[in-house]
A protein has these predicted regions:
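Beta-rich nucleic-acid/ligand-interaction surfaces
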Residues: 114, 126-149
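Short flexible coil/turn linkers enriched for glycine and charged/polar residues
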Residues: 97-99, 142
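Short cationic amphipathic helices and targeting signals
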Residues: 101-107
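Short amphipathic alpha-helices in soluble, non-transmembrane regions
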Residues: 116-123
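Conserved small/polar residues in nucleotide/adenosyl-binding loops
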Residues: 153-154
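Mid-length scaffold segments of soluble, non-membrane domains
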Residues: 107-108, 113
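Charge-rich, low-complexity segments
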Residues: 1-96
Protein backbone atom coordinates (compact mmCIF):
# COMPACT_ATOMS: atom_id res chain seq x y z
CA UNK A 1 0.00 0.00 0.00
CA UNK A 2 2.82 2.39 0.91
CA UNK A 3 4.68 1.57 -2.30
CA UNK A 4 1.58 2.24 -4.41
CA UNK A 5 1.06 5.56 -2.60
CA UNK A 6 4.70 6.53 -3.22
CA UNK A 7 4.44 5.58 -6.90
CA UNK A 8 1.33 7.73 -7.33
CA UNK A 9 2.95 10.65 -5.51
CA UNK A 10 6.12 10.31 -7.58
CA UNK A 11 4.10 10.19 -10.81
CA UNK A 12 2.05 13.29 -9.83
CA UNK A 13 5.24 15.20 -9.02
CA UNK A 14 6.97 14.22 -12.24
CA UNK A 15 4.03 15.17 -14.42
CA UNK A 16 3.62 18.66 -12.98
CA UNK A 17 3.98 21.31 -15.65
CA UNK A 18 7.17 22.82 -14.23
CA UNK A 19 8.88 19.41 -14.24
CA UNK A 20 7.73 18.64 -17.77
CA UNK A 21 9.07 22.02 -18.91
CA UNK A 22 12.47 21.22 -17.36
CA UNK A 23 12.50 17.85 -19.10
CA UNK A 24 11.66 19.55 -22.43
CA UNK A 25 14.41 22.14 -21.87
CA UNK A 26 16.89 19.36 -21.14
CA UNK A 27 16.04 17.40 -24.27
CA UNK A 28 15.78 20.37 -26.63
CA UNK A 29 19.51 20.49 -27.57
CA UNK A 30 19.49 16.74 -28.28
CA UNK A 31 16.30 17.01 -30.35
CA UNK A 32 17.81 19.90 -32.34
CA UNK A 33 20.94 17.86 -33.02
CA UNK A 34 18.91 14.85 -34.17
CA UNK A 35 16.82 17.13 -36.39
CA UNK A 36 20.04 18.38 -38.00
CA UNK A 37 21.09 14.78 -38.73
CA UNK A 38 17.63 13.92 -40.12
CA UNK A 39 17.89 16.88 -42.49
CA UNK A 40 21.41 15.83 -43.51
CA UNK A 41 20.10 12.33 -44.30
CA UNK A 42 17.34 13.79 -46.47
CA UNK A 43 19.86 16.01 -48.26
CA UNK A 44 22.28 13.16 -49.02
CA UNK A 45 19.44 10.87 -50.11
CA UNK A 46 18.31 13.61 -52.49
CA UNK A 47 21.85 13.96 -53.84
CA UNK A 48 21.96 10.25 -54.66
CA UNK A 49 18.49 10.31 -56.23
CA UNK A 50 19.54 13.23 -58.43
CA UNK A 51 22.76 11.43 -59.41
CA UNK A 52 20.77 8.32 -60.28
CA UNK A 53 18.39 10.38 -62.41
CA UNK A 54 21.29 12.11 -64.19
CA UNK A 55 22.86 8.74 -65.00
CA UNK A 56 19.51 7.59 -66.33
CA UNK A 57 19.28 10.60 -68.66
CA UNK A 58 22.90 10.70 -69.85
CA UNK A 59 23.91 7.05 -69.87
CA UNK A 60 20.56 5.24 -69.97
CA UNK A 61 21.35 3.36 -66.76
CA UNK A 62 20.29 3.49 -63.14
CA UNK A 63 23.28 2.47 -61.04
CA UNK A 64 21.42 2.72 -57.73
CA UNK A 65 19.17 -0.20 -56.81
CA UNK A 66 18.10 1.06 -53.39
CA UNK A 67 18.73 3.79 -50.84
CA UNK A 68 18.08 3.21 -47.15
CA UNK A 69 18.83 5.47 -44.23
CA UNK A 70 18.87 5.27 -40.47
CA UNK A 71 19.37 7.50 -37.46
CA UNK A 72 21.11 5.94 -34.47
CA UNK A 73 18.69 5.45 -31.58
CA UNK A 74 19.11 7.38 -28.31
CA UNK A 75 19.86 4.06 -26.53
CA UNK A 76 22.60 3.22 -28.99
CA UNK A 77 24.10 6.70 -28.70
CA UNK A 78 24.06 6.44 -24.90
CA UNK A 79 25.73 3.01 -24.97
CA UNK A 80 28.46 4.33 -27.23
CA UNK A 81 29.05 7.35 -24.98
CA UNK A 82 29.15 5.14 -21.88
CA UNK A 83 31.62 2.77 -23.56
CA UNK A 84 33.87 5.76 -24.29
CA UNK A 85 33.23 7.09 -20.76
CA UNK A 86 31.82 10.35 -22.09
CA UNK A 87 28.94 12.49 -20.80
CA UNK A 88 25.56 12.49 -22.50
CA UNK A 89 25.89 15.95 -24.05
CA UNK A 90 25.39 17.20 -27.57
CA UNK A 91 29.05 18.27 -27.68
CA UNK A 92 30.21 14.77 -26.74
CA UNK A 93 27.89 13.27 -29.34
CA UNK A 94 29.03 15.60 -32.14
CA UNK A 95 32.73 15.28 -31.36
CA UNK A 96 32.95 11.53 -30.73
CA UNK A 97 30.27 9.64 -32.64
CA UNK A 98 30.68 9.50 -36.41
CA UNK A 99 27.85 7.10 -37.26
CA UNK A 100 24.78 8.89 -35.92
CA UNK A 101 23.31 9.10 -39.40
CA UNK A 102 23.84 6.46 -42.02
CA UNK A 103 22.82 5.97 -45.61
CA UNK A 104 23.16 2.69 -47.47
CA UNK A 105 23.27 2.94 -51.24
CA UNK A 106 22.96 -0.42 -52.99
CA UNK A 107 24.31 -0.73 -56.53
CA UNK A 108 24.10 -3.74 -58.84
CA UNK A 109 27.68 -3.49 -60.02
CA UNK A 110 30.89 -2.87 -58.12
CA UNK A 111 32.10 -0.17 -60.51
CA UNK A 112 28.85 1.75 -59.93
CA UNK A 113 29.64 1.96 -56.22
CA UNK A 114 32.86 3.80 -56.97
CA UNK A 115 31.17 6.00 -59.61
CA UNK A 116 28.49 7.08 -57.14
CA UNK A 117 31.06 7.70 -54.39
CA UNK A 118 33.18 9.81 -56.74
CA UNK A 119 30.17 11.82 -57.90
CA UNK A 120 29.11 12.48 -54.31
CA UNK A 121 32.60 13.54 -53.25
CA UNK A 122 32.96 15.93 -56.21
CA UNK A 123 30.16 18.07 -54.82
CA UNK A 124 31.25 21.34 -53.21
CA UNK A 125 29.27 20.85 -50.01
CA UNK A 126 30.60 17.36 -49.23
CA UNK A 127 34.00 16.73 -47.61
CA UNK A 128 35.42 13.25 -47.11
CA UNK A 129 36.60 12.64 -43.55
CA UNK A 130 37.38 8.93 -43.76
CA UNK A 131 37.12 6.16 -46.36
CA UNK A 132 36.94 2.45 -45.50
CA UNK A 133 37.06 0.24 -48.56
CA UNK A 134 35.85 -3.21 -47.58
CA UNK A 135 35.35 -4.07 -51.26
CA UNK A 136 39.04 -4.00 -52.09
CA UNK A 137 39.90 -5.18 -48.57
CA UNK A 138 37.01 -7.40 -47.35
CA UNK A 139 36.63 -8.17 -43.66
CA UNK A 140 37.49 -11.68 -42.49
CA UNK A 141 33.76 -12.42 -42.36
CA UNK A 142 33.52 -11.72 -46.10
CA UNK A 143 31.72 -8.40 -45.58
CA UNK A 144 32.21 -6.10 -48.58
CA UNK A 145 31.20 -2.47 -48.67
CA UNK A 146 32.50 1.04 -49.20
CA UNK A 147 32.09 3.29 -46.17
CA UNK A 148 32.44 7.04 -46.54
CA UNK A 149 32.39 9.27 -43.49
CA UNK A 150 31.60 12.73 -44.79
CA UNK A 151 31.01 16.22 -43.54
CA UNK A 152 28.08 17.94 -45.18
CA UNK A 153 27.97 21.74 -45.36
CA UNK A 154 24.41 23.01 -45.25
Amino acid sequence: MLIKHLQEHFFRELTKTEHLEKIKEGTLPYNRLMSYYKCAIMEVETKFKVLNEQFSLHYDENPIEAIKSRLKSPDSIMKKLRKKELPFTTDAIEENITDIAGIRVVCSFEEDIYKMADCLLQQDDVTLIERKDYIKHPKESGYRSLHLICLLYT
